[in-house]
Regions:
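Hydrophobic/aromatic beta-strand patches that form the interior of the parallel beta-sheet core
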Residues: 17-19, 60, 111, 134
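Charge-patterned, long linear interaction tracts outside catalytic cores
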Residues: 32-35, 180-206
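Gly/Thr-rich phosphate-binding beta-strand-loop-beta motif of the actin/hexokinase/Hsp70
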Residues: 54-77
């Protein structure tokens, strides 16, 4: 398990490598970070996927339909940080797509934030998997939750540089995250990320 200092140094070093490997995406993200809610000293933080971590908790946080998007975050706990190792970011189509995405991602528990309309789907999902499936009703004022959890994101959430380079859905998720402001409709990624943070803090996993 890496110490905070070791992990921080490696993360900082890896960001410089990312500039060379995917400079176009990095410059685009950097411009967004300067004005972004989640920017800490002008940057968001990445983890080095080549560094071995002892993950102690693995969570899926899912919103089946937020502004017409199905968003899933797969987050693993490493020390006192959370690594966003994968995401699903796509138009909401069928519950079968949602089910297959949940079942194909490793986790200790899965949290689904949704309206009552998805409860029959969740009952069926629970009968078809041994995963722990938790349900949360949609938060009534997501902008307030986003604002309340943004400092935690700055300090404790690390994103995958390799996914930014290679995964179109991860890039779309990051673009959506960088473009968030409370007056826009671009809030799908922030809504789900804030839900994840609320969940881990509530359970004392922060």
């Amino acid at each position: 398990l890496q110490t905070y200092e070791e992990h921080g140094h490696l993360s900082d070093t890896f960001r410089y490598v990312v500039v060379d490997l995917c400079s176009e995406q990095y410059i685009e993200f950097s411009n967004r970070r300067k004005r972004n809610l989640y920017a800490c000293n002008g940057t968001v933080n990445f983890f080095n996927p080549d560094t071995e971590c002892k993950y102690t908790k693995k969570i899926l946080y899912v919103m089946p339909n937020v502004n017409g998007k199905f968003v899933l975050i797969q987050a693993f706990r490493c020390g006192n940080k959370w690594h966003v190792v994968d995401v699903v970011f796509m138009d909401t189509t069928s519950t079968e797509d949602i089910r297959s995405s949940i079942l194909s991602h490793e986790s200790d528990s899965c949290v689904i934030e949704c309206t009552d309309a998805y409860f029959p789907f969740i009952r069926e999902l629970r009968s078809s998997t041994n995963k722990e499936i938790r349900v949360m009703k949609e938060f009534p004022d997501v902008d307030k939750r986003i604002a309340a959890t943004s400092d935690y994101v700055k300090n404790s959430i690390l994103f995958s540089a390799s996914k930014v380079e290679s995964d179109t859905e991860y890039v779309a998720f990051m673009n959506n995250l960088m473009d968030y402001n409370k007056d826009s409709e671009t809030k799908e990624a922030s809504a789900v990320l804030s839900g994840l943070v609320q969940f881990v803090v509530k359970l004392g996993l922060n």
